[in-house]
Amino acid sequence: MSADFINQPTFQYKNEYTTQSGNHNEVCVLIGHSIEAVTSAVVLASLGQRVHLYADNELLTQQIQQYGFEHHLQALWQMYEQQQVIISTALPASADTLIQYYETTNFSDSRHINESNEIDDQSTVALYWLFLDSIKPVWAEASWITAFNHSHQQSLPVIISGTEKLGVVSALAQNLQRAWVYYVPFVFLQEGDVYSSMLNPSLWLLGEKTANSRQHLEVLKPLMQHARAAHHADIATIEFARSSIMAMLATRVSFMNEMSRLADSQQVDIKQVSRIMGLDARVGSSYLQAGWGFGGNTLPTELAKLQQSSQTHSLDMPLLQSVMHINEDQKELIFRKFWQYFDGFIDNKTVMIWGGSYKSGSGRTAGSAIHPLLALLWSYNIRTLVYSDKAQDELAMLYQQQSLLQLINNPYQQLSAAQAIFIVSWSPQDQLDIAKLNQHAMPVFDAQNALTRLQIDSLVGDYMGIGRSK
């Protein structure tokens, strides 16, 4: 990827906002190794800011490698690191050490955290941004709060990000003595396109400890202005809104998956039903796709935290429990269709699996249906040929000792050796070659409902989807 290409989407931001952001000697201090922290560092650098990122170096390297499919982010990260616009440094053992370093009059004196970094003597901190998931294993909560409360720079804003039980972030903000404390939930982040989804967020939520104080976050002004929708409120309200949004999305997915089972019994195509439902403005079209369910880290983590919140207050949430139960059961549904198709005679077969990530465009397999599917297939000594271009490295690492797994580089490679095809995650941008499938006339078990009705009708072999069939 050329430097010219890399700079195209950020050029207007730099021209428009670099002069507004004021002091070029300011640095944004980010603390975390998560994909949210890395993306924030790159986006801030794209907006003309200098960034110091503190993280566990080993975990940071792993995170960047695991998100190798985020090509734009990777290229920008490398470029900004080479230019020292982003400087990543090992996270010190205590928050006090880090804060004291920035409160010295000369960053380059003997109290250097990392002596290899060449930092302008006149640098000042624009903000601190804490990513809770990353700091919790290293810094005890009481110690980092005390360190920030003992800081001599109480006018500096502190941003907190992370998914916690309801009220946790609000309590942290109250324990911090400074007025300018904010909460930014990453409800806008779209895996597979994390950079663009943060640069132009679909929804920007900002929790404020002190009402109507967002003017103190001048650095983030471009993101707020370019968001398709934005809202600010007290931190507790934003926490609750974040959790409610994610729970609603998960509920829609599980509802459609429950309806897909009824659609199977009625010989109705649930995909067509989803399109019709989307025409109703009261319903909308988002998250109405039936399939194997949802995975990743965001929705499952959010539901788990919400469940913990309800238990803390002794509240029963049967709807939430049903959503989680349906989702886990749905991941095994496509295997049951496979078992029924062959009347249980599935031992020692060979099958092809297309896709392994939890969503098309991602290279992450956390919560993906491929894991229970593989476990069930292997329990019958079934050989599995898996094509998953973006998730191949992660699958190879997870299952390196599994002799029944073979990772292949072409979806049509070894089709003649398989007795069935499973589709777990297939990108809409990748055209399916129905003619090649028809050369073998094997059954297709589509857990993603990836095929169009025209493609299904063109198949010589049988087709079983989720709430749809041939």
Q: Residue locations for each model-derived region?
A:
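NAD(P)+-binding Rossmann beta1-loop-alpha1 motif at the extreme N-terminus of oxidoreductases
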Residues: A3-H71, H112, V351-V386, G465
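Interdomain hinge/lid region at the active-site interface
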Residues: A236-E239, A250-G344, K349
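Rossmann-like NAD(P)(H) cofactor-binding subdomain of soluble oxidoreductases
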Residues: N106-D109, T124, L130-G192, L451-I456
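Rossmann-like NAD(P)-binding element
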Residues: E81-S155, Q413-Q431
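Internal alpha-helical scaffold of NAD(P)-dependent oxidoreductase catalytic cores
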Residues: A171-Y182, D193-S285, T312-H313
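Active-site rim loops that border cofactor/substrate pockets in soluble metabolic enzymes
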Residues: K359, Y380, T384-N409, Q414
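Flexible, Lys/Arg-rich cytosolic regulatory linkers and terminal tails that connect or flank
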Residues: Q12, N175-M198, S202-L203, L454-K470
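Rossmann-like adenosine-cofactor binding region
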Residues: Y399-K470
